[in-house]
C-alpha cells in the first residue's frame, strides 16, 4: 500500500510543479509598483480613506425615540 500511495503522492507533486512551471512570474518590485498604482488610482473610492457619510452609515448610533 505504501508504494502505491508514494506513487500517487509523487504524481500529485509532478502535476503541481507542471502547473507552477506554466505560470508567468512577475518581479516583486513590479508587482509592488502595480499595486501602489492601483491603490492611488482608486483611493477616492475607498471608504477607509474617505470615510462614510453619516446618512448612509448602517453602523451609526441609533437616535432615541422622542415619544417615550
Curated annotation (Swiss-Prot):
PROSITE patterns for the chain: G_PROTEIN_GAMMA (PS50058)
A Pfam family it matches: G-gamma
Domain G protein gamma intervals: 3-68
Compartments where located: Cell membrane
Chief localisation class: membrane
Membrane topology of the entry: Lipid-anchor
Keywords: Cell membrane, Lipoprotein, Membrane, Methylation, Prenylation, Transducer
Keyword rRNA processing listed: no
Assembly description: G proteins are composed of 3 units; alpha, beta and gamma.
Family that this chain belongs to: Belongs to the G protein gamma family.
Function comment: Guanine nucleotide-binding proteins (G proteins) are involved as a modulator or transducer in various transmembrane signaling systems. The beta and gamma chains are required for the GTPase activity, for replacement of GDP by GTP, and for G protein-effector interaction.
Name of the protein in question: Guanine nucleotide-binding protein G(I)/G(S)/G(O) subunit gamma-5B
Amino acid at each position: 500500500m505504501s508504494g502505491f500511495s508514494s506513487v500517487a503522492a509523487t504524481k500529485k507533486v509532478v502535476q503541481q510543479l507542471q502547473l507552477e512551471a506554466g505560470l508567468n512570474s512577475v518581479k516583486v518590485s513590479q508587482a509592488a509598483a502595480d499595486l501602489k498604482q492601483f491603490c492611488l488610482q482608486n483611493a477616492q473610492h475607498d471608504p477607509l480613506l474617505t470615510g462614510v457619510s453619516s446618512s448612509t452609515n448602517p453602523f451609526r448610533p441609533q437616535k432615541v425615540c422622542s415619544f417615550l
